[in-house]
Amino acid sequence: MPIAVGMIETLGFPAVVEAADAMVKAARVTLVGYEKIGSGRVTVIVRGDVSEVQASVSAGLDSAKRVAGGEVLSHHIIARPHENLEYVLPIRYTEAVEQFRM
C-alpha cells in the first residue's frame, strides 16, 4: 500500500484543530502531529494510504475554511515520500501516535 503525507497550514490554531478533526474523521489516516511555525501559522500532518490522505486533506480544507478568523495558507500531499524524509522532517510515526495507526 503506497503511503502518503498530507499537510495543511493555517493561520490560527482553531482552524488547524478543526482541520485535524475533520481529517481523521473523513478517512483512515493517522494524525502524525502538528508544528507551530510562528506568527500564528500552524501545520497539521497526517499519513496513510494515498487515496485516504487525499480525501482527508480535502475534508480538512473544507472544515478549516469555515472557522471564523481562521485562514488556510497552504496544503500539500506527498505520495510515497522518500524514507529519508522521516529522519529530517516531523512526519515519522512516534510512540505517541503508534496506537492510532490504521
From Swiss-Prot:
Q: Which PROSITE patterns match?
A: BMC_1 (PS01139), BMC_2 (PS51930)
| GO molecular function list | structural constituent of carboxysome shell
The record places domain BMC at: 4-90
Its domain of life? Answer: Bacteria
Q: How is it used?
A: Heterologous expression of 12 carboxysomal genes in E.coli (ccaA, ccmK2, ccmK3, ccmK4, ccmL, ccmM, ccmN, ccmO, ccmP, rbcL, rbcS, rbcX) leads to the formation of bodies that resemble carboxysomes, have densely packed paracrystalline arrays and RuBisCO activity. These structures open the door to generating carboxysomes in plant cells to increase their photosynthesis and productivity, as well as tailoring bacterial microcompartments to specific metabolic needs and molecule delivery.
Query: Where does this protein chiefly localize?
Result: other
Q: Name one Pfam family in it.
A: BMC
Keywords of the record, alphabetical order, are: Bacterial microcompartment, Carbon dioxide fixation, Carboxysome, Photosynthesis
Q: Which Gene3D superfamilies match?
A: 3.30.70.1710
Single GO BP term = photosynthesis
Q: Write down the SUPFAM superfamilies for this protein, in alphabetical order.
A: CcmK-like (SSF143414)
What happens biologically when this protein's gene is inactivated, per the record? Answer: Cells do not grow in normal air but do grow on 2% CO(2), called a high-CO(2) requiring phenotype, HCR. Cells make aberrantly large polar bodies instead of wild-type carboxysomes, no accumulation of CcmO. An alternatively generated deletion mutant does not form abnormal polar bodies.
Q: What does this protein do?
A: One of the shell proteins of the carboxysome, a polyhedral inclusion where RuBisCO (ribulose bisphosphate carboxylase, rbcL-rbcS) is sequestered. Assembles into hexamers which make sheets that form the facets of the polyhedral carboxysome. The hexamer central pore probably regulates metabolite flux.
Family matches, as PANTHER family: CARBOXYSOME SHELL PROTEIN CCMK4 (PTHR33941:SF13), PROPANEDIOL UTILIZATION PROTEIN PDUA (PTHR33941)
Q: Which family does it belong to?
A: Belongs to the bacterial microcompartments protein family. CcmK subfamily.
Q: What's the protein here called? A: Carboxysome shell protein CcmK2
Q: What organism does the UniProt record list as the source?
A: Synechococcus elongatus (strain ATCC 33912 / PCC 7942 / FACHB-805)
